[in-house]
Every structure is written in structure tokens, then in C-alpha cells.
């Protein structure tokens, strides 16, 4: 995938989130999804390339990120299966109610107080809006939990990347009662990195 200034460089552990989604929606099983904070589009496009029965939305608040997503979408000839949407507030997204089978996201999750301590090659060159998750790294997750139940079909899945175990504990305390825990996934270092919920 092509990346450049203004977009997050995909991380290896994010591949595990894609693999998890494909376990629930394997090749040939049709579904409609949203990739929130799509960045370069790598998550959404990887899903579409692996499962030809999927269609999706790639959503981001950054016009620069969406330009890269559009470049990658065109490169992989997936314009007819991935729509791109600029949105900063999940509550205002132009998505029909209960229309999605799953939502997947690698959102900004680094606590604001830890931004200054990031490695220079990350802090100085990658877009802060793709990294800075506000207080405790939880700002966008809170918005997700308020809005996403309205977008997901009953039984729909929410698959999230996180900062790790301590943040997941905080998320479990914040998540809407409309969601049931399905799975937690370890990254390559044995840290709980991803969490999956199902809408009741």
C-alpha cells in the first residue's frame, strides 16, 4: 500500500485485526462494513482483496489520509466496492441505521500525555491526529460506543485495535451494555492488542 505525508504507516500488528475479521467473514460470505479511521485504506482494502463478497466504507476525518486511501483504492481497482467518507464525528456520519455487519477500526489510541515520549521517527513524521487519543487514549472510543450500536445490525461485530492490556481494561468499563465480549487477540509480543464485541 502506498503511504506518505499525512497518513499513518500501517503496523504489522494491524494485520492480526484483519485476519480476525476474515475468520468471522471468510471468503464468499457477504457483508457490509465500515473501516473507521481508515488512513491509507489498508485495512478495508485488505479485507476486500481477501473476500470478494464484502463491500465497505472507509471513513476518516483527514482529507490527506483519504487522498492516500483513494490512491490505494484505484491501484487495486476497488472503486466499486469501497466508498470513502470524510467524517470527524461518528454521531454525524451519513450511514443508515443498522446497515453494517461489522465495524473495524485502528483509531488514535496513544494517551495525550505520552505523545512527547514517542520515538522521534514516529512523533516527528507521522500525523498526530492519527496517534493522539486524548485523555487516556480513550476519546474516540467513547464516541464509538455512543454511536456504533445504531449503525450495526443486531449481531454485528465491533473489532478494535488498542494500546494494550491496561487500555482494554478501561474500555471494558466504558463499553455500552449493547455489546457482548467475543474475543481478545494477542499481538506478536504477547500483548492483548485487539478486542472484539458483538452487538446484542
Label the predicted regions:
Residues 1-8:
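Dynamic helix-loop-helix/coil hinge segments at AAA+ ATPase domain boundaries and subdomain interfaces
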Residues 2, 135-197:
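Conserved Class I SAM-dependent methyltransferase catalytic core
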Residues 9, 16-117:
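Conserved SAM/SAH cofactor-binding pocket of Class I
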Residues 11-12, 164:
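Helix N-cap/beta->alpha junction signal
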Residues 21, 47, 122, 144-148:
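Class I S-adenosylmethionine-dependent transferase superfamily signal
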Residues 109, 198-200:
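C-terminal beta-strand of the catalytic ATP-binding
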Residues 109-140:
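Mobile active-site "lid"/loop adjacent to the S-adenosyl-L-methionine
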Amino acid at each position: 500500500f502506498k503511504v506518505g505525508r499525512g497518513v499513518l504507516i500501517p503496523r504489522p500488528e494491524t494485520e492480526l485485526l484483519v485476519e480476525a475479521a476474515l475468520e468471522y467473514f471468510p471468503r464468499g460470505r457477504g457483508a457490509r462494513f465500515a473501516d473507521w479511521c481508515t488512513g491509507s485504506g489498508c485495512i478495508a482494502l485488505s479485507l476486500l482483496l481477501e473476500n470478494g463478497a464484502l463491500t465497505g466504507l472507509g471513513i476518516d476525518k483527514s482529507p490527506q489520509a483519504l487522498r492516500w486511501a483513494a490512491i490505494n483504492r484505484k491501484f487495486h481497482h476497488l472503486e466499486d466496492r469501497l466508498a470513502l467518507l470524510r467524517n470527524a464525528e461518528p454521531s454525524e456520519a451519513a450511514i443508515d441505521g443498522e446497515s453494517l455487519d461489522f465495524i473495524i477500526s485502528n483509531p488514535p489510541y496513544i494517551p495525550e500525555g505520552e505523545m512527547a515520549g514517542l520515538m522521534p521517527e514516529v512523533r516527528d513524521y507521522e500525523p498526530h491526529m492519527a496517534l493522539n487519543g486524548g485523555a487516556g487514549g480513550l476519546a474516540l472510543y467513547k464516541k464509538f460506543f455512543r454511536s456504533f450500536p445504531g449503525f450495526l445490525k443486531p449481531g454485528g461485530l465491533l473489532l478494535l485495535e488498542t494500546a494494550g492490556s491496561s487500555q482494554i481494561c478501561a474500555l471494558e468499563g466504558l463499553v455500552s451494555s449493547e455489546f457482548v465480549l467475543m474475543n481478545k487477540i494477542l499481538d506478536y509480543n504477547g500483548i492483548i492488542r485487539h478486542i472484539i464485541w458483538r452487538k446484542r
